[in-house]
Each structure stands twice: as C-alpha cells, then as structure tokens.
A protein has these predicted regions:
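Structural signal for membrane-spanning alpha-helices in multi-pass inner-membrane proteins
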Residues: 19-24, 169-173
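A transmembrane-helix-recognition feature enriched in membrane-embedded lipid enzymes
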Residues: 151-175
Length: 175
C-alpha cells in the first residue's frame, strides 16, 4: 500500500512538472524577420504591447489581430492610420482553433512563410500547437508573462483552461 502511495505521489509530481514546463515556462522562439506578427484574442494588454514593440523593430510588415471590438487600442489599430498594415480577423465562433484556421487561410492567400505568434506565456503551448497545424509555414512563439498581474483564482482558472485545451488539442489532431 505504501508503494502505491509513493507511486501516485511521484506521478503527481511528474505531471505537475510537465504542466509547469508547458504552461508556466514554455519555450519562446528567437525573434527573426517574419511576414506577420499575430496576436490572438483575449485581453490584449501586455501581448499587444509586445507585438507593437516588435512592429517598431520592423520584424514584420503586417500585424494580425483578433478584431474583437471590446478593446479600445485594438479598435484603434483596426481602423488604420499606423505605419504598418493591420489585418483584423473576426473568426466565428471566436476560439484559438478558429483564429488558427483564419490565419492559415490568410497566410496561404498571401504566400507567407513565417509568422510570430505573441500570446500569454500560459497560452503559448496550446496556441502554438494549433497555429502550427493550420499555418503551413513556420510559427515562432513569443510568450508574455501575464499570470503575475492576475489574482490566484484567475491564474488557476487560466492554467486549468489551458491544460484542458492542450489535452483536447493533443487528441483532436485536425486544424
């Protein structure tokens, strides 16, 4: 009985370490020139700021945003008037998978070979998985730390959502 308890504890620790490596400390790619910088939906906050920093460094000529009309800065960028092209997507229903599908179509139409996906660090693994399935070029992921700026309840909720989404994305293998 004692061995079973030890084995269960070991599995729990290993699973926790795996989830932490995938959701809390995911790998981000090296930022290199690309065809577009992409910011998926959700509260854009720090992700949008990081994307705008990349655009200011001229790493890509196009910024792709989820055009959800709930965020003033996103609305402003979608109206244009900036030094780079902004493409605003509105996939229905709004989901990471549908955003990845929309980007896949857009990238195919435009002949893109590489995009930089800027999202929260907790979302990098799942979003990267889905965008790589739907976009036929290279997807470089850039994670932005956001869990430090939210409460414990929201952080746990976000981690649980991403863990479930990552499990679903691993089972449902289509774009």
């Amino acid at each position: 009985m004692r061995r079973v308890g030890s084995a269960v504890a070991l599995v729990a620790v290993l699973l926790s370490m795996l989830l932490a490596s995938l959701l809390i400390w995911p790998r981000s790619g090296t930022v290199v020139p690309a065809d577009a910088v992409v910011v998926p939906s959700g509260d854009p906050g720090a992700r949008l700021e990081r994307a705008l920093q990349l655009m200011a460094r001229n790493v890509a000529p196009t910024l792709v945003l989820d055009g959800t009309p709930d965020f003033a800065r996103v609305d402003e960028l979608c109206r244009g008037g900036v030094a780079f092209e902004v493409v605003c997507l509105r996939p229905e229903p709004d989901s990471t998978r549908n955003e990845a599908r929309a980007l896949g179509r857009l990238g195919k139409d435009r002949g893109w070979r590489r995009v930089i996906l800027v999202t929260s660090s907790v979302h990098v693994s799942r979003a990267g998985l889905l965008f790589r399935r739907c976009f036929k070029g290279e997807v470089v992921t850039v994670g932005v730390a956001v869990l430090r700026s939210v409460g414990i309840r929201d952080a746990v909720r976000a981690l649980a959502h991403e863990a479930g989404g990552l499990a679903h994305g691993s089972v449902v293998r289509r774009c």
